[in-house]
Amino acid sequence: MNIKVFTCGGTFEKVYNPISGELSFQDSCIPNVIKRSRITLKVDFEELFFKDSLNMDNDDRLMIAHKIKIEPIKNIVVIHGTDTMVQTAQTIKEHASQDKVVVMTGAMLPYSIKESDAMFNFGGAFIATQTLEPGIWISMNGHIFRSDDVEKNKRKGVFERA
């Protein structure tokens, strides 16, 4: 089995810059996440762009949906910012083929920070792509959600059933 991993950036991919005191994007952490996870399946990785999901627009979402639609690999993980992940999932559902298992995930803290949830969420999404039926899913906080039955609770900082 092959797994495709697309990254769009989001907090998952950000790195703390000690000079500016800001979080910003550098090189993708996903190759290191895959290596540290000791994954033995074939993984095809592709960077789509590096954006905070609050800065994504409809064209970005349509581009993600198009890349998924034309991707020959049927099991796909999408790394995405958490603020608009549900919105992008709906766009994918509307515009991409429904014969693939697409699992979106992200992180509340960057992978580069020790207490991050990034590795856990990636592992959950990676395994979910191998076990779920075709559709658009979100894997966050140890749960798997259907894309049309989930919301981010910004007060608690977790994803919940809608």
Could you say what each language-model-derived stretch is?
Residues M1-A162:
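Active-site histidine-anchored catalytic micro-motif
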